[in-house]
Amino acid sequence: MLFKTIEQAKEFILDNEIEMVDFKMTDIDGRWRHITIPAARFNENTMKYGIGFDGSNYGYAPVENSDMVFIPDLSTAAVDPFAEVPTLTMSGDAMIIDRPENRPFDQYPRNVIKRAVEYMRESGIADEMIIGPEFEFHVFDNVQFETRPECVRCEIDTEEADWNTGSSEDGFQIPHKGGYHIGAPQDRYYNLRSEMCMLMEDWGVKVK
């Protein structure tokens, strides 16, 4: 949902009985972090002054100079389909506290891409940037890892693996390196992938 004003967002919150508003950011390693406030506290001041956070815990600043603010981006708002409490979630920008006004933190990923687009247009390279990330990952049933002075080990397992042929598979086990575009019933995660795709489409992410 693309909110253009805080009034539109507040109206949606009331109409849909949203109880919490969640703000998502990434740290220096690219991991999601979030700050959550009651929906009743989400107002014009939130958009103007932002939400304060300690940038040192994100890897963005030293402890002695770590005060930063998060400014929400209403155009990224969506209802969190996984939260048990009705929650509106959105991303935004990390800013360095400064006077007379705060300034964008130049290492924050969203600010990096904004500068890249600005440079692209100013230099005449192009007038539009299209980014198509590939959602590639593995699904495991169990992952174990251990690091000790005398030992480093990692163990993974999935029911689709060829080493599980003795686990009452009734002939449906995928052979070694034979799982590319495999069909049912060997493809055990079709429903999982389909649900992921539907959720992304609902959030405006077009899936090829």
How would you name each of these model-derived features?
Residues 1-208:
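Glycine-rich, acidic/polar active-site loops that bind/position phosphate-bearing ligands
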